[in-house]
Amino acid sequence: MIKIIFLLLSFFYISNNVFAQPPGKERNIDWPCIQVYIEELSWGSIWTGPVLTENSAKWIDNKDIFSLAEKLMDRKTKEKEGTDELKKYIKKNKSSDKLTMLFHALFDTTNTIWKIRNEKLLNFGKRQRLTSEKIALKLEKIKELSKDFESNKDEIQKLENEKFWDIRRFEDRRNLSDSLCEQPRFYEKRLGTYAGIMLENTN
């Protein structure tokens, strides 16, 4: 039983150490995902069209582009619906400047979502780390109190009950981690799909 609990407590730390940050980057101990932690996206790894400039950054003042970017990056928008909307826009706005501005809007929108999702994942990971530390401390205390079980049985029972629920919470959250960790990648993939369509129509 102790071995099983030890493996459970080790899961959080093993995942962080095996899938460490690239050399030169400090690992965030609260990052709960096997995917490498990337603080923000780089447009150069997605977009090979015209360079994003102060001019393309003016998308924020363009109501049509602003609303289109929000709709295209909304998780509720199905990919086919999004690509159809994008192609309609391209038919009416084929200029390189317009498409670059739209990509800039999509990129900035995605990056904002990316940062928010990552912050939530870090908070999730911190809760897991703190819970695992609580369990380890209770195990240590139970071990110490068990040296005089009869005198400490009430306290031991109390700690055993708390430990049970701590482990239950830890496991319940761990079962959610894979789907939560995939959420930022969903938006990155969607952005890549849209970028590919726009690049086909960019001179």
Predicted regions and their residues:
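Short, charge-rich amphipathic alpha-helices with coiled-coil/heptad character
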Residues: 90-119
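Short E/K-rich amphipathic alpha-helical oligomerization segments
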Residues: 137-165
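Non-transmembrane amphipathic alpha-helical segments
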Residues: 110, 117, 124, 128-146
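Alpha-helical oligomerization segments
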Residues: 154-203
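Surface-exposed polar/charged interaction patches
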Residues: 75, 89-96, 109, 127, ...
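N-terminal Sec/ER secretory leader and immediately downstream segment
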Residues: 20-96
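Sec-dependent N-terminal signal peptides
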Residues: 4-14
